């Protein structure tokens, strides 16, 4: 898994960088992208602007470091999930995983707000766009590792991953307005994905 952020000046993250990131993330969550400026971060962190810029030379570098705080946590959580087993109860295993992923987006509201801000920023910022592209590639690789034992072929696996990730991401945004429960959707998505994983492409 890749990470874009390395602290400036060869320094490891310390209390000051953590404070800057805490303040910046709070500003992004409460004020949105347009309320997040280096000067505002410095003010809220009780630091000088030059001190903030010592650790983060530009707003783009700060945005990427902030993204690492959240997005890498998601990758780590997913990577720690054991792969599914090709043995019995494949449906139950897959359903449990998908239910967990769908529920995660609903329960961690702060994280979801940060994600949504980054999706919006990426439409205007090439650095953030590149970061998200790398993140989703990494996420696809991790997801493929988890689903691979159930897949009949590489093609079937690739299609399944391409179904799961966009659906889960979109569900976190739209679920509150959907007419069906998360349990119903988990079951339906499990059926669709499992059928795809079992498709023979020979």
UniProtKB/Swiss-Prot annotation:
Signal peptide: none annotated. Residues 14-74 form the HTH tetR-type domain. This is Uncharacterized HTH-type transcriptional regulator in dhlA 5'region. InterPro entries: Homeodomain-like_sf (IPR009057), HTH-type_TetR-like_transc_reg (IPR050109), HTH_TetR (IPR001647), Tet_transcr_reg_TetR-rel_C_sf (IPR036271). GO terms for molecular function: DNA-binding transcription factor activity; transcription cis-regulatory region binding. Keywords: DNA-binding, Transcription, Transcription regulation. It comes from Xanthobacter autotrophicus. Gene3D superfamilies: Tetracycline Repressor, domain 2. The lineage of its organism: Bacteria, Pseudomonadati, Pseudomonadota, Alphaproteobacteria, Hyphomicrobiales.
């Amino acid at each position: 898994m890749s990470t874009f952020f390395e602290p400036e000046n060869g320094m490891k993250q310390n209390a000051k960088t953590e404070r800057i990131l805490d303040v910046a993330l709070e500003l992004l969550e409460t004020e949105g992208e347009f309320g997040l400026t280096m000067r505002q971060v410095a003010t809220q962190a009780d630091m000088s602007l030059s001190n903030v810029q010592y650790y983060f030379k530009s707003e783009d570098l700060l945005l990427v470091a902030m993204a690492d705080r959240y997005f890498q946590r998601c990758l780590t959580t997913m990577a720690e999930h054991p792969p599914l087993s090709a043995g019995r109860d494949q449906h139950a295993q897959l359903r449990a995983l998908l239910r967990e992923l769908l529920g995660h987006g609903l329960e961690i509201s702060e994280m979801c707000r940060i994600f949504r801000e980054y999706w919006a920023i990426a439409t205007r910022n090439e650095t953030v766009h590149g970061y998200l592209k790398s993140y989703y590639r990494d996420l696809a690789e991790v997801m493929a590792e988890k689903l691979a034992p159930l897949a009949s072929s590489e093609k079937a696996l690739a299609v399944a991953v391409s179904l799961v990730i966009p659906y889960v991401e979109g569900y976190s945004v739209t679920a509150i307005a959907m007419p069906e429960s998360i349990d119903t959707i988990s079951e339906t998505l499990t059926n669709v994905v499992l059928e795809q994983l079992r498709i023979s492409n020979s």
